[in-house]
Amino acid sequence: MEFINKAELKTTNEYLKNIKNPRILIAGCGTGQHSMLTASRFKNCKVTAIDISKNSLAYAKRKTEELGIKNIEYYQADILDLKNTFSDFDIIESAGVLHHLEDPIAGWSSLNSLLKPGGIMKIGLYSQLARKHIFLNKKEIKEMKLLPNRSDIKSFRNMIINSENEHHRTLIESPDFFSLSEVRDLLFHVQEHTFTIPAIKEILSSLGLIFCGFDNPRIKNLFKNKFTENSDIYNLDLWNDLENSNNFIFSGMYQFWCQKV
């Protein structure tokens, strides 16, 4: 597939290069933006998009129909309960979903069971280092016994605006800070797990997956600027060194590709 070269992914066999009509799963499609972008990115693909929310799926279906996109099918489904319904995908994408599960590794393992050998998977996970300030704010919210309602969210946000504490000032720089719904997702989400690069390396190994590369070109340029020209951009130990020297490079998420071997 042409995408492999464009994204500078390191894959280990010829399987992907010979796929003419890739079957793709979007696990946690939300309101459909992700699935529609993927459907347009891969030539002659068939996309299966799942989400737990009926409201999100209804919106996604409506927008997909409005845009005349014909190669996406939407289903309500739980990531942990897919094996009896779906199987044999060439590509699986799940960004911003696994870290909100009670057991993210179980969710990741469930997706991995649906991926064909040689297939690739894009995963998005929160960085522990990049979200240190988020953790401190969430701790305060818990201590103050605030609830995810409009009044408490506005009250906490106003407190932050008038604060000189570093973890508060860092939060103000987030584009999510100026929308109540985004602040709710950012700070009041009940369940959230964070990860480190060494932890991701260990999980990949346990699931029989190999790291193929990060998805963000800007982050790749940071790597190239820090290390020598001959440094291995697919070496997660070097990426860990880079993140330790710049804690906020994965402030959105770790978004990376891996391959089932």
Regions from the language model: what does each represent?
Residues I120-H168:
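Conserved class I S-adenosyl-L-methionine
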Residues S53:
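Conserved SAM/SAH-binding beta-strand->alpha-helix loop
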Residues M1-R23, L37, R41:
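Conserved alpha-helix/loop element of class I SAM-dependent methyltransferases that forms part
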Residues A60-K61:
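Conserved SAM-binding loop
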Residues G68-L80:
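Conserved SAM-binding strand-loop segment of SAM-dependent methyltransferases
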Residues N162-V261:
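Rossmann-like AdoMet/SAM-dependent catalytic core
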Residues K83-I92:
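A short acidic, Gly/Pro-enriched loop at the edge of an enzyme's catalytic core
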Residues I105-P117:
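A short glycine-rich, Lys/Arg-flanked "PGG" loop and its adjoining helix->strand segment in the class I
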